[in-house]
């Protein structure tokens, strides 16, 4: 049985070395635990910031790390994170300006610090630390180093490092993804000690580029040798990066027997040179005609405008060296502007352009040209101007009408009234509030290009929109209420605190619900879903363990926090726990001084900690799949019981930290031990998935035997709880029964009761008043509800939650009401914190919409439309629209038309009566891609939708046809902005401030005042931007309380409240929007 000895140096207990030579040895040691703590003075002067070496990456263990004496393991602890951004320097100076005395930078570099500052902390057991509300730190927060103004003399020990100048040379390293032979590799060029200060720092840089399930944590050579230190990486070498410790051999860098070319270089697979194209769409974010990157003789970026419709225009890169005739180029340009047979090009002053040489020479300073089929330029009317203001520059210079020959406009196509000409803008829309934003500025605004799932999409700016502000909004989100309960996949997750509050968890939030005051408090220290929880014997502290996220900053760990102050007291397991925490439990006999944690990784490592001191007492790999729980024996703090699928074992911890295992259930066994309780004399009570309760006793030789076994329920038992008077309560998951058994009379049944079918099976039972024998209990169910009652009276609902995936959400247009619907076939109406009604419809509803007069429409996965009366929840009408799911539903502004987007890609339009209860099918507009979001235009003439591939499509509701030109639709005003793509919401994609790359925005909502944008992504992040949100530099306020996808977000009437739904446990959360 693989075991890990705990006899390793503990964090904070390493003393500083007695003499300077030990420090000199350490500076020359290649160990990555303290790597990258030196930097040349020129680098410090250049960046103006301190250097930080992240304290170890790669999760080194004592068994694999080089063994050295404690003195040689001494490390200077670096404290300030290296960054090229100048704002980090200001932040460092602000912290350093406090009351704490900070040693000089060069003194710390040369080992002149003493005490805990210079003590190397062991990463072998990754002991805990005070949290200090820092979610992403792997070490205790310390004050950044401050560089002194005058540089002292460098000691000989530190200066000796500079003798090897090759160490500071730039290195080029290529990394491959573990187990993926087709991954082309990520190339990184860096200077050790400057660009990259430690192996941890290097892994942080490449994690966003590797798309690993838990981020980059381990580095291996191509032969599988693990690299622990930055010094081990050689220039020009190739390495493999993994989230886990297991290396997978593969032909990295090869495909079909040929090596890939190095990233950034052309290899054998490069495409042959092709004929130079005459025109191509210009990437305005990277091309500049004035920067000298493209010579005038080679090509030009120009703006071309349709002479017949000035709102149709485009920026193109024109190749002046093409072999095509000028006339063919004009025809190609005409196709871009939807002009058939374009033959003429004019400047804004009416001069005709006849050749490429004129574009290079005579019209070199002209950037705007008009294309026409006739012989002259058609002038538009000038912009209306106020007499009290100076003239505003027009979008393009136009010839006076009397100087142009009159040309008949037979070829001019009719224009829609919803597409205003850009030259007829009113004065109020021409100027920004500061009076300096003219129409010329609008014309210079370039289309936005966004890359989504590897495909580039272009969104065109409307002529009139509010000014973009990239600063974060002046309001923030504050969690106000959490609806629901995690009973669908969790056990032992409901308690009653001494204050009378109910304690349970939903998503990444621990909820403390006071029924008497009708109020909630929330502990939000976790960044991913909570997987397990336990209450300290004092009932004043709580330990909760979370799962691991996709990045390295959301690692699995356990947090111990106070129920009174909601402050984090201790965190442990960072870097030690793999993919999550299966179980956590406090010891009982010694008053909760010990705590155990079981890792949900492949080895299911059991570890025991003395949490007040941060000591790891021991750990062992159980190697048990399907392990679901663990607990200390109440009469022996060194005896631990683990249970799970086909597993029940006792672990006795010896004084040396090793564990002795005794298996009670012999392998193989199909039974799943679901719960464990104890009799007052120490005998063990277990419940299993077959409905049996078993009592184990110990004989005089210390061996365990089955004393009693009986069938308590038809099928699986969800939980057991032993009350103080010796009564055992058991709850069935399948038969929904709760039974009471008298342990003093050989477990004779006292009474039983059955929960309603709508409530679900029993997941957890807890007495309402612990210590009292009144029989009142709380019950958590498998359908995410909490009930209260007793075996003598009926159960009533305390907390309602949707039992399966929750997708549908709609906000009432004129009231603080909102409705939810999910795959559990329930539709519910809420008023902020209160449930008004809930109905079971018989259909899995995924889309909701409110009629302007209060009717609720619900679209189902079977293609039905349900019309519900909001007064009483009665279903008034059921229509079969199609055979595919209705993913999005919306009424137009006046409520006389409803549009439904289907999984088959079509839009279905129905005429609606004034009261919203009568519907008549108008027609459908065929499409090809599944639709996910939908918005109506303000005038009710158009609909915009988003496909499953994030394409933005437009539909003409009057002509019942798709609108093919996104440029023609750029000035349409939309009633809502629920579509996740578009010019005014492009800043929520590929934002530079996101912690992860390739973020997929799943939902968004615009406030009624058009000043805020709420956005939710597939990783569970909720963000609040200013609206419009155009630039990828737009800043935001962020919260993360979901691990799964945030399915839908909506503002309530008045813009004071935000509602979110989603996650893996169908959680519903209410957020207050407060001043920052």
Swiss-Prot record:
Molecular function per GO: microtubule binding; microtubule stabilizing activity
Cellular compartments annotated: Cytoplasm, Cytoskeleton
CDD domains named in the record: DCX2_RP_like
Positions annotated as WD repeat: 525-571, 576-621, 623-661, 668-706, 712-751, 801-840, 842-878, 881-920, 926-965, 996-1035, 1041-1076
Domain Doublecortin: 171-253, 300-384
Low complexity: compositionally biased ranges: 36-55
Pfam families: Beta-prop_EML, Beta-prop_EML_2, DCX, HELP
SMART domains per record: DCX (SM00537), WD40 (SM00320)
Alphabetical UniProt keywords: Cytoplasm, Cytoskeleton, Microtubule, Repeat, WD repeat
Span list, region Disordered: 1-143
Biased composition (Polar residues): 70-81, 107-124
Primary site of residence: cytoplasm
Example of a GO biological process term: cellular response to mechanical stimulus
PANTHER family noted in UniProt: ECHINODERM MICROTUBULE-ASSOCIATED PROTEIN-LIKE CG42247, WD-40 REPEAT PROTEIN
Family, per entry: Belongs to the WD repeat EMAP family.
Described function: May modify the assembly dynamics of microtubules, such that microtubules are slightly longer, but more dynamic.
Name assigned to this protein: Echinoderm microtubule-associated protein-like CG42247
Organism, scientific name: Drosophila melanogaster (Fruit fly)
């Amino acid at each position: 049985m693989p075991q890990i000895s705990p006899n390793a140096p503990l964090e904070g207990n390493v003393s500083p070395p007695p003499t300077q030579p030990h420090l000199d040895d350490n500076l020359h040691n290649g160990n990555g635990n303290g790597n990258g703590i030196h930097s040349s003075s020129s680098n410090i002067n250049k960046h103006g910031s301190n250097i930080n070496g992240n304290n170890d990456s790669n999760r080194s263990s004592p068994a694999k790390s080089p063994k050295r004496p404690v003195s040689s393991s001494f490390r200077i602890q670096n404290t300030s994170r290296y960054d090229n951004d100048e704002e980090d320097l200001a932040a460092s100076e602000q912290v350093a300006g406090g009351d704490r005395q900070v040693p000089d930078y060069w003194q710390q570099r040369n080992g002149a610090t003493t005490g805990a500052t210079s003590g190397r902390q062991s990463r072998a057991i990754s002991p805990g630390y005070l949290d200090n509300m820092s979610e992403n730190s792997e070490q205790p927060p310390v004050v950044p180093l401050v560089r002194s103004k005058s540089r002292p003399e460098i000691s000989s020990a530190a200066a000796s490092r500079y003798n090897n100048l090759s160490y500071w040379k730039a290195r080029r390293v290529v990394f491959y993804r573990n187990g993926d032979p087709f991954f082309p590799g990520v190339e990184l060029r860096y200077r050790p000690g400057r660009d990259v200060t430690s192996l941890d720092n290097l892994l942080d840089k490449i994690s966003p580029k590797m798309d690993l399930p838990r981020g980059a944590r381990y580095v291996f050579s191509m032969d599988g040798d693990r690299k622990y230190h930055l010094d081990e990486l050689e220039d020009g070498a190739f390495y493999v990066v993994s989230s886990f410790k297991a290396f997978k051999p593969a032909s990295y860098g090869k495909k079909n027997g040929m090596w890939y070319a190095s990233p950034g270089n052309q290899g054998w697979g490069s495409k042959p040179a092709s004929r130079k194209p005459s025109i191509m769409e210009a990437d305005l974010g990277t091309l500049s005609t004035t920067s000298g990157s493209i010579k005038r003789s080679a090509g030009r970026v120009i703006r071309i405008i349709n002479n017949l419709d000035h709102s149709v225009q485009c920026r193109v890169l024109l190749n002046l060296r093409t072999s095509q005739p000028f006339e063919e180029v004009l025809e190609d340009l005409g196709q871009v502007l939807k002009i058939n047979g374009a033959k003429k090009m004019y400047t804004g002053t009416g001069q005709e352009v006849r050749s490429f040489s004129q574009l290079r020479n005579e019209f070199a300073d002209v950037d705007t040209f008009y294309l026409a089929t006739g012989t002259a330029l058609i002038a538009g009317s000038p912009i209306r101007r106020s007499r009290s203001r100076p003239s505003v520059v027009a979008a393009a210079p136009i010839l006076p009408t009397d100087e142009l020959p009159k040309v008949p406009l037979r070829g001019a196509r009719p224009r829609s009234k919803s597409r205003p000409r850009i030259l007829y803008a009113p004065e109020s829309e021409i100027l920004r509030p500061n009076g300096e934003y003219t129409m010329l500025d609008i014309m210079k605004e370039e289309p936005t290009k966004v890359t989504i799932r590897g495909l580039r999409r272009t969104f065109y700016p409307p002529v009139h929109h509010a000014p973009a502000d990239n600063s974060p909004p002046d309001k923030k989100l504050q969690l106000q209420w959490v609806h629901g309960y995690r009973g669908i996949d969790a056990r032992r997750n409901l308690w009653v605190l001494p204050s009378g509050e109910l304690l349970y968890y939903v998503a990444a939030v621990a909820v403390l619900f006071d029924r008497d005051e009708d109020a909630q408090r929330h502990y939000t220290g976790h960044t991913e879903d909570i997987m397990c929880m336990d209450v300290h014997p004092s009932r004043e502290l709580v330990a909760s363990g979370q799962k691991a996220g996709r990045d390295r900053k959301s690692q699995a760990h356990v947090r111990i926090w106070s129920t009174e102050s909601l402050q984090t007291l201790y965190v442990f397991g960072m870097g030690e726990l793999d993919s999550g925490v299966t179980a956590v439990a406090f010891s009982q006999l010694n008053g909760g001084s010990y705590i155990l944690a079981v890792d949900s990784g492949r080895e299911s490592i059991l570890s025991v900690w003395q949490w007040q001191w941060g000591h790891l007492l021991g750990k062992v790999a159980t190697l048990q799949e399907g392990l679901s729980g663990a607990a200390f024996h109440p009469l022996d703090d060194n005896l631990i019981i683990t249970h799970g699928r086909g597993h029940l074992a006792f672990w006795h911890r010896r004084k040396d930290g090793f564990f002795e295992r005794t298996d009670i259930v012999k392998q193989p066994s199909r039974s799943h031990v679901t719960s464990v309780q104890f009799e007052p004399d120490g005998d063990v009570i277990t419940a299993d998935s077959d409905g049996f309760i078993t009592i184990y006793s110990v004989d005089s030789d210390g061996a365990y035997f089955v004393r009693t076994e009986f069938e308590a329920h038809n099928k699986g038992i969800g939980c057991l709880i032993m009350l103080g008077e010796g009564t055992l309560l058991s709850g069935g998951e399948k038969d929904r029964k709760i039974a009471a058994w008298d342990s003093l009379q050989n477990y004779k049944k006292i009474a039983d009761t059955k929960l309603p079918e709508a409530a679900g099976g029993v997941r957890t039972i807890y007495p309402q008043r612990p210590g009292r024998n009144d029989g009142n209990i709380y019950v958590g169910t498998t359908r995410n509800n909490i009930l209260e009652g007793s075996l003598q009276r009926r159960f009533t609902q305390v907390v309602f939650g949707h039992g399966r995936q929750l997708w549908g959400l709609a906000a009432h247009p004129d009231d603080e009401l909102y409705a939810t619907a999910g795959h559990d076939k329930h539709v519910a109406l809420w008023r902020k914190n209160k449930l008004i009604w809930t109905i079971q419809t018989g259909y899995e509803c995924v889309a909701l919409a409110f009629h302007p007069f209060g009717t609720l429409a619900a679209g189902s996965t079977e293609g039905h439309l349900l019309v519900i009366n909001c007064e009483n929840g009665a279903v008034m009408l059921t229509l079969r629209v199609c055979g595919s799911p209705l993913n999005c539903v919306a009424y137009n502004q006046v409520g006389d038309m409803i549009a439904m987007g289907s999984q088959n890609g079509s839009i279905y339009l129905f005429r609606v009566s004034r009261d919203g209860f009568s519907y008549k099918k108008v027609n459908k507009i065929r499409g090809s891609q599944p639709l996910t979001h939908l918005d109506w235009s303000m005038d009710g003439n158009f609909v915009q939708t988003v496909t499953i591939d994030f394409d933005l499509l437009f539909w003409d509701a009057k002509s019942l046809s798709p609108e093919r030109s996104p440029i023609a639709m750029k000035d349409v005003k939309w009633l809502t902005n629920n579509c996740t793509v578009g010019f005014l919401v492009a800043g929520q994609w590929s934002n530079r401030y996101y912690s992860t790359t390739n973020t997929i925005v799943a939902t968004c909502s615009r406030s009624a005042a058009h000043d805020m944008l709420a956005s939710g992504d597939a990783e569970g992040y909720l963000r609040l931007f200013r609206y419009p949100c155009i630039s990828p530099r737009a800043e935001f306020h962020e919260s993360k309380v979901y691990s799964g996808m945030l399915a839908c977000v909506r503002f309530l009437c008045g813009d004071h409240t935000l509602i979110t739904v989603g996650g893996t446990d169908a959680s519903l959360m209410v957020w207050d929007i407060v001043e920052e």
